[in-house]
Curated annotation (Swiss-Prot):
Assembly notes: Homodimer.
GO BP, one annotated term: carbohydrate metabolic process
UniProt gene name: tal
Residues forming the catalytic site: 132
Name of protein: Transaldolase
Species in which this protein is naturally found: Yersinia enterocolitica serotype O:8 / biotype 1B (strain NCTC 13174 / 8081)
């Protein structure tokens, strides 16, 4: 009998949400996603020590200023890990822009181009890279500019329908709506503590976004992210892509039985609405207390881990 991971792959592109090379070799995903937290975890893996040493040596060659060396080495380490992962996957690596730039369009564009340049210098073309940006208004504007310059983007920390709509209207390549973190918020802030998979607020959110995109003919890829259990994944089978942590990839691979398509749009494509203005975006996003909390919390957490990574690099310089 076929295992659930093999079955899921027939209807959805499976992406690995990890920086762990061993997991890549084991589960052979199409693409991979990283973020500051995953890079920090990956940096603890002994096999990656040479990548850290190389990044530090390179940073020392670029500048004699300690603060600049930290920035350079951190960027280079993220790219070095991405390069190792790209050896094992046929598709794309997602590398994230510093979360502390989430409200600065100009700085986000500059950092994205810096990361792309490092990949290009290592012989990797733009079509194998996605630049991850937080789905703030400023991050979406940065992505809009980058897309026009041939740099595809993955808009992350997406929790509200307003964020999803603004991303599609900006023509971004891919969005990563966070399923599990939405569930976390509702469990922590509501009376209901258990949800059937089809009632899971994160599943409901991604389903709504998927249907809206297909209904209006948006090309932006929907990639569900941040899963807490197998039920969420099974309920979103048919989504364009799903990025899944190694622990859940293992669970899927060890579970027998078919996975049936749950997401599909069979209606006619309708006209696109007038794009949201900045004021409309903020007003609609502000109506969702979960999205307000989780976007801010996600940016803070990624920024904290970026700081820890920089501290580790600083101590080694």
């Amino acid at each position: 009998m076929t295992d659930k991971l093999t079955s899921l792959r027939q209807i959805t592109t499976v992406v690995a949400d990890t920086g762990d090379i061993a997991a890549m070799k084991l589960y052979q995903p199409q693409d991979a996603t990283t973020n500051p937290s995953l890079i920090l975890n990956a940096a603890q893996i002994p096999e990656y020590r040479k990548l850290i040493d190389e990044a530090i040596a390179w940073a020392r060659e670029q500048s004699s200023d300690h603060a600049q060396q930290i920035v350079d080495a951190t960027d280079k380490l993220a790219v070095n890990i991405g390069l190792e992962i790209l050896k094992l996957i046929p598709g794309r690596i997602s590398t994230e822009v510093d979360a502390r730039l989430s409200y600065d369009t100009v700085a986000s564009v500059a950092k994205a181009k810096r990361l792309i340049k490092l990949y290009n210098e290592a012989g990797i073309s733009n079509d194998r890279i996605l630049i991850k940006l937080a789905s703030t208004w400023q991050g979406i504007r940065a992505a809009e500019q980058l897309e026009k310059e041939g740099i595809n983007c993955n808009l992350t920390l997406l929790f509200s329908f307003a964020q999803a709509r603004a991303c599609a209207e900006a023509g971004v390549f891919l969005i990563s709506p966070f399923v599990g973190r939405i569930l976390d918020w509702y469990k922590a802030n509501g009376d209901k503590k258990e949800f059937a998979p089809h009632e899971d607020p994160g599943v409901v959110s991604v389903t709504e976004i998927y249907q809206y995109y297909k209904k209006h003919g948006y090309k932006t890829v929907v990639m569900g992210a941040s899963f807490r259990n197998l039920g969420e994944i099974i309920e979103l089978a048919g989504c364009d892509r799903l990025t899944i942590a190694p622990s859940l990839l293992k669970e899927l691979a060890e579970s027998e039985g078919p996975v049936e398509r749950k997401l599909a749009y069979t209606g006619e494509v309708q006209a696109k609405p007038t794009p949201l203005t900045e004021a409309e975006f903020y007003w609609q996003h502000n109506q969702d207390p979960m999205a307000i909390d989780k976007l801010a919390d996600g940016i803070r957490k990624f920024a904290i881990d970026q700081g820890k990574l920089e501290k580790m690099i600083s101590d080694l310089l």
